[in-house]
């Protein structure tokens, strides 16, 4: 059973969504977002941005500050979190089978968003920094997490559109089946429509302050000449 409906806002003159409906803003023009975002904030209405590419860094920073201050959930869709191989990797980490997490490494292909890769690193290990990112030599996003009991490696090959996940604990090595390269957007929208925000954010989705932190981390990575 859905808790609410989703309303796609793709034009500036749309009506304010009905009570309970969650708006997903897909407005490429800054002036249109400048019209809609204050309206939704004033109405204390949780909402989502369709993509991080559709919003400026300045807007992300301001949204993060506003959502914290007003305790208003603001999600940003089209993240990498719910791509199946990374979602399963998160399940492995949260299960505790790897023990205490102490390291994460994300290899970032040149053509891939460093911000979204940084968000993966922070999602898996909140203490991660730019040092946890490295430039990939091919078009694969490779994520390695190490805990006190073992290690897990997730690889998403963007060219072959294939994914793999392997877990090693002691002498035991296991390949975990994951769906191949599919969009995470459907899963993100399902979360928006089928769950209620907890502690002022939707579980699993990238929040505005997550995006702000990932931007800072990615900038440090790029400034250091690693991408």
Predicted regions and their residues:
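C-terminal helix-rich "cap/oligomerization" subdomain common to oxidoreductases
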Residues: 2-3, 21-31, 38-39, 72, ...
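A contiguous active-site-proximal alpha/beta segment in oxidoreductase catalytic domains
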Residues: 5, 54-112
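Structural motif
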Residues: 7-11, 25-30, 49-53, 78-79, ...
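Short acidic low-complexity segments
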Residues: 11-21
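Beta-strand-loop-alpha-helix segment that lines the small-molecule cofactor/substrate pocket
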Residues: 22-79
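A general structural signal for well-ordered alpha-helical segments in protein cores
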Residues: 33, 37, 60, 86, ...
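Rossmann-like dinucleotide-binding domain that binds NAD(P)(H)
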Residues: 105-150, 156-160, 209-213
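NAD(P)-dinucleotide binding in Rossmann-like oxidoreductases
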Residues: 134-193, 200-205
């Amino acid at each position: 059973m859905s808790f609410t409906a989703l309303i796609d806002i793709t034009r500036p003159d749309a009506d304010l969504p009905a009570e309970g409906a969650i708006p997903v803003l897909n407005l490429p023009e800054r002036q249109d977002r400048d019209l809609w975002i204050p309206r939704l904030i004033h109405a204390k209405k949780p909402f989502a941005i369709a993509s991080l590419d559709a919003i400026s860094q300045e807007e992300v920073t301001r949204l993060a500050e506003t959502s914290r201050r007003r305790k208003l959930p603001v999600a940003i869709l089209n993240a990498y979190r719910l791509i199946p191989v990374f979602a399963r990797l998160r399940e492995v980490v949260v299960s505790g089978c790897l023990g205490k997490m102490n390291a994460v490494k994300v290899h970032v292909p040149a053509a891939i968003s460093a911000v979204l890769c940084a968000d993966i690193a922070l999602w898996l290990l909140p203490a991660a920094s730019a040092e946890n990112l490295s430039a990939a030599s091919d078009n694969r996003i490779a994520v390695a997490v190490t805990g006190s009991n073992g290690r897990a490696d997730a690889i998403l090959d963007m060219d072959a559109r294939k994914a793999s996940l392997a877990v090693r604990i002691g002498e035991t090595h296991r390949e975990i089946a994951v769906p191949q390269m599919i969009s995470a957007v459907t899963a993100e929208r399902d979360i928006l429509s089928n769950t209620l925000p907890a502690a002022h954010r939707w579980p699993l989705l990238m929040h505005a302050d997550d995006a702000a932190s990932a931007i800072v981390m990615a900038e440090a990575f790029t400034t250091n000449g690693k991408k």
